Curated annotation (Swiss-Prot):
This is Uncharacterized protein csb family protein DDB_G0271320. InterPro entries: Dicty_CAD (IPR008601). The lineage of its organism: Eukaryota, Amoebozoa, Evosea, Eumycetozoa, Dictyostelia. Belongs to the csb family. One of its GO terms (biological process) is cell adhesion.
Amino acid sequence: MTEKMHELKITIFTDKGRSTISGIDFPLPVLPYPAPYTFRLYGYKIEGPNLTNKEFKVKTGKIEYKGEEFDIPPSSKGSWRGVDEEMDLTYVTIYPSRQPKKVFHY
């Protein structure tokens, strides 16, 4: 049985302003605590100035997935990298500064 794919949207605020990145998400396993959030997005769109660099520091932010919102704790860090321009894939990883009140789950 194939897994149902869902739209995922990440919004972050930094010193440079507000940015979003969204696309269709593939779940990836994680083990550290607090666990980093790693997303592989295809058909992604980037809005705002924060994701022009490969690394960012979050003042505040949230993840929107399946109609739910999950906060990104202040002072969290993140990174993104393009994987395959032909398939329009990228990876986004967020390293929470502390365990979020509501932990993101698939």
